[in-house]
Amino acid sequence: MKELSSAQIRQMWLDFWKSKGHCVEPSANLVPVNDPTLLWINSGVATLKKYFDGSVIPENPRITNAQKSIRTNDIENVGKTARHHTMFEMLGNFSIGDYFRDEAIEWGFELLTSPDWFDFPKDKLYMTYYPDDKDSYNRWIACGVEPSHLVPIEDNFWEIGAGPSGPDTEIFFDRGEDFDPENIGLRLLAEDIENDRYIEIWNIVLSQFNADPAVPRSEYKELPNKNIDTGAGLERLAAVMQGAKTNFETDLFMPIIREVEKLSGKTYNPDGDNMSFKVIADHIRALSFAIGDGALPGNEGRGYVLRRLLRRAVMHGRRLGINETFLYKLVPTVGQIMESYYPEVLEKHDFIEKIVKREEETFARTIDAGSGHLDSLLAQLKAEGKDTLEGKDIFKLYDTYGFPVELTEELAEDAGYKIDHEGFKSAMKEQQDRARAAVVKGGSMGMQNETLAGIVEESRFEYDTYSLESSLSVIIADNERTEAVSEGQALLVFAQTPFYAEMGGQVADTGRIKNDKGDTVAEVVDVQKAPNGQPLHTVNVLASLSVGTNYTLEINKERRLAVEKNHTATHLLHAALHNVIGEHATQAGSLNEEEFLRFDFTHFEAVSNEELRHIEQEVNEQIWNALTITTTETDVETAKEMGAMALFGEKYGKVVRVVQIGNYSVELCGGTHLNNSSEIGLFKIVKEEGIGSGTRRIIAVTGRQAFEAYRNQEDALKEIAATVKAPQLKDAAAKVQALSDSLRDLQKENAELKEKAAAAAAGDVFKDVQEAKGVRFIASQVDVADAGALRTFADNWKQKDYSDVLVLVAAIGEKVNVLVASKTKDVHAGNMIKELAPIVAGRGGGKPDMAMAGGSDASKIAELLAAVAETV
């Protein structure tokens, strides 16, 4: 068996299948495009579904690939086993209605055993097969495999409900008796016993039958076009061919582990408990590739998966003694390992590192905030004499602070407290139940009732007209089809229409319907797509309408043009975002209204004022450049070759519309647009905000609204100039700055006066010194305006040797503020305040020399002061 690097294994795989007439399908992005059924690309075949379902006919029915994939259904096992991973590479070869069983098995055996290729020893290979699949058994025998190396397994049959199905045959490598301490042998395979001796390296699925749940498998009908779908994990092949005990000791992971050794000062031992090393190495690979492919950490979906992976890796870093941000430092190593086939990680490493480091820093703050709350909870348990942290409190730490449950468990148990696991599960279930109950179904247009679903009449939208004559095909009133209607509201379908149905972020047209006399018989207030795709006009009926009659349909042209200004400007904005803040800023949603446009995009931080200025300037430059706007109908692949930027998550057919604005912007879009960018007139950003982790929103206006926005700003500036008595508008900023400086000086003077007053009052407070357990302390209630004054008292106290400990309490409004300061090592201010604060229904914490807390029960202030002697 050849000892090859992972890069050599990958390349040899692709070269072999190319020699058998296969074309190489490039590895796709981990984030699926136009496939809402998948969170991630999770296998080699996932990107080829379009070929297997017949929606796209491949130029070559023989395909091979090396596909990066992510699976997250078993995250907790990563690091515990030798072969679990979140991100992995699946090597595959596929036949779409071309070769079948004989070639798949023969060529597979050749690749594995030929001295020209992998050169596996034949006696180390074992194959499982479906018992009724005698053809596969016989084919393996024909290849020279000993019958004793063929194991029938009842589960070797692939099917998911009705549809394509078939037997599969798996190939295993025998690592020998050293990995079978109980000498169980082939029973490990036959009885599917978890083991480290027989390593599955390849699975060949023979898509042969059309599964029918109503009949036994023996009666399944054969498919007219049979397919081959195979998958071999690169990580497992590398482990076998490099003689590694686990996948983690291969060249895919060890360079990362070596870097973790340097960062932690700990040593990885292949025979020891190395879970934390493995978790970190695995998770940073997944994070690097996923972020490089456009996914960002967040609170839901893919973002939540990434956040969970990062936080799990950080916690394992802490177990290794790494308490500072460190994961981001591993990104270049991941890029170097994978550079030969996936150069994008190194190319984007600066961006990936920035995202990872930012998320690490956010999590560090989360840990700090959660730790303070947990400390308060544990202090309260101690004060109440309890020994168990309640599930509802664990859940609050998890839900409100984002504090990992496992960290809560670890810290609480280290402090000697038990954990209410069942209570936590109950609180979690209650939240899930509330979330499900809060789901509200959409309105009538969201429900495909039988009446709407029964509309089969054809209807065509005409892009390039504002008015046309068309025959009325369908009338629906009171949820029933009718031949005529004379009042109320109705839904109408015409043979053709100039009215755009709401789609792709563009709002629907409005307008009117006229009869042959020119009288308006209906007002169109909305247009949506019917279940079968026809534009469905919602109208207020003003006069009689009847099926089969021709009417003139007129849209509100002024409104359409205003919407088109915003839609075309949205395309310019998308391109400008790419140019100014980076190509990772991809569309996450949009709305093009008459009055404004709204654009949501992926980005990891607020867009700075300077960046917004550049974006706004660049969009206006393209408007003033008077770029010609063209639309082309073509297929998706040609659109990509034209440089189309995004698919917007829409489901497109074989023909798509490409909207091109000069040489500046190219996008797939089914909406309506202007003819020239100059028709937009003017573009103005009015707001930029965050709408969730990793997602930002820009709201902008165009044309008349943009002019109004600028004029409103000018009016506001004039008002400010008049208020500060600036002689000209350009002098207003300097006048405001001068007033601000003056105010700051007055505030400083006021603060100094307050300090002097506090110092005078402190003389009386500091006279009352008590002693307990050999510690001198002052405990007093003071009358102050804010918590800052308490700190001023403490600062004055520190200047002289009044006492060892200072405890001050103040009732400020409805709240109680408590301060503890300590000069002696015998009293920890942070710990002391945790014992005192609960007396006034408060919580708090701090450092050994200074701590503060807030409470709500002012009636217990005297009790708190009396308790000081017991707590010093």
From Swiss-Prot:
Q: Do the record's keywords include Nucleus?
A: no
UniProt keywords (A-Z) are: Aminoacyl-tRNA synthetase, ATP-binding, Cytoplasm, Ligase, Metal-binding, Nucleotide-binding, Protein biosynthesis, RNA-binding, tRNA-binding, Zinc
Principal localisation: cytoplasm
Domain of life where this protein originates? Bacteria
Residue stretches spanning the membrane: none
Gene Ontology cellular-component terms listed:
cytosol
Q: Name the PROSITE patterns on file.
A: AA_TRNA_LIGASE_II_ALA (PS50860)
Q: Where in the cell is it found?
A: Cytoplasm
Cofactor binding note: Binds 1 zinc ion per subunit.
Q: Which reaction does it catalyse?
A: tRNA(Ala) + L-alanine + ATP = L-alanyl-tRNA(Ala) + AMP + diphosphate
Name its GO BP terms in alphabetical order.
alanyl-tRNA aminoacylation
Give the matching SUPFAM superfamilies.
Class II aaRS and biotin synthetases (SSF55681), Putative anticodon-binding domain of alanyl-tRNA synthetase (AlaRS) (SSF101353), ThrRS/AlaRS common domain (SSF55186), Translation proteins (SSF50447)
- Single GO MF descriptor: transferase activity
Q: Which Gene3D superfamilies match?
A: 2.40.30.130, 3.10.310.40, 3.30.54.20, 6.10.250.550, Bira Bifunctional Protein, Domain 2, Threonyl-trna Synthetase, Chain A, domain 2
Question: EC no.?
Answer: 6.1.1.7
Q: What is known of its domains?
A: Consists of three domains; the N-terminal catalytic domain, the editing domain and the C-terminal C-Ala domain. The editing domain removes incorrectly charged amino acids, while the C-Ala domain, along with tRNA(Ala), serves as a bridge to cooperatively bring together the editing and aminoacylation centers thus stimulating deacylation of misacylated tRNAs.
Family, per entry: Belongs to the class-II aminoacyl-tRNA synthetase family.
What is the role of this chain?
Catalyzes the attachment of alanine to tRNA(Ala) in a two-step reaction: alanine is first activated by ATP to form Ala-AMP and then transferred to the acceptor end of tRNA(Ala). Also edits incorrectly charged Ser-tRNA(Ala) and Gly-tRNA(Ala) via its editing domain.
What protein does this entry describe? Alanine--tRNA ligase
The organism named in the record is Streptococcus pyogenes serotype M12 (strain MGAS2096)
Top-level taxonomy: Bacteria, Bacillati, Bacillota, Bacilli, Lactobacillales
